[in-house]
Amino acid sequence: MKYDVAVIGAGPAGSASALKLSSLGYKTLIIDPCDTKKVCAGILTAQYVRKYGINHDFVERKLKGSRISFRDVHAEITYREAVEYSINRESYDRFNLNEAIIAGSLLCKDKVLSVEENRSAILIRTNNETITADYAILASGISDLSKLFGGTKKYAFCVQQKKFIEPDDYYEIDLQPGAYSWVAPKKDHVLTGTSSLVGYPDIPGEKSLIPLGPVKKTFSKRFLLVGDAAGFVSPFEGEGLYYSRRSGEIAAETLSDVMAGKNKLSDYQVRWKKEFDFSALSMISYLISNNMILEAFVRSTRDSEEFNNFVENILTGENKKFKIQEIGLLIKMLSKIIN
């Protein structure tokens, strides 16, 4: 059987793509061995909740806010109106995949060995068969396959552990120049994670890679890159669930138009760039990339209500398209403290 679209990967980006395409009547196949665990804090930001709502089947805790720290300087951000949730990532992925299957997507539980892109189709070889599709969406995260097709090659090395200690209702982020650690509260335990730019931290736990920014080109003749494969995460704290799901939808919408003869695949890049503004967040990450400025950043968050509100907007996704004036506020306030 030839499919309209093959979706490689059944995470939030892949399932969102498949759900949208199947709902529009396209013959869609999801390919994923469904045997891997994802290193993920599992936080649904206020931006995500505003866009998609919440299903409490996979929610483990409603969050009151976040704490950020650098060395012995700590700041607490209690959200004014934003609502965020800590989720069970495996349950979340199963829920999204099931929604796509209910909508009509087929699931191939197999590992992709190779992909060939030619003028007329995509040929995908798995352990057990060769699959043909008109187009493909690559939603397999950071992998050898995604790198082969232009996926992100800039990433951090992360290790995550489950610890059975009493959780509270705050997500904790320990900032370091070029890296960060986190404590994500769950129902009866916490997930602690540590990242590094130079290799996996020497601690036990589940290992994974987290992208450090979007790739230059997210499309080819018959391929679209989505989610982590495209590098879609916040440069500030690595949040990626909103970007994964939304990029999957944008990819599906673009392919629907392409198959209807209305657009080209390159339109995908135009569309996601209109919605995702990583430049301001990258600038913020760059500004706090040394110890002195980072300490001033956390201290300002602790001591200034105005600055605390600014950081809340970053963490909750309340305003992902920061204005130049807001970046100027950051520079001005940090300069006062440093001087």
Each language-model region and where it sits:
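Beta1/beta-strand and adjacent pyrophosphate-binding region of the FAD-binding site
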Residues: M1-G11
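Glycine-rich FAD pyrophosphate-binding loop
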Residues: A10, S22-C40
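N-terminal FAD cofactor-binding segment of flavoenzymes
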Residues: P33-F70
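Short beta-strand to alpha-helix junction loop
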Residues: Y79-E99, L197-V198
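FAD/FMN-dependent oxidoreductases across multiple families
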Residues: S114, T130, S195-K262, S266-V270, ...
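C-terminal helical "tail/cap" subdomain of flavin- and related membrane-associated enzymes
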Residues: S256-N339
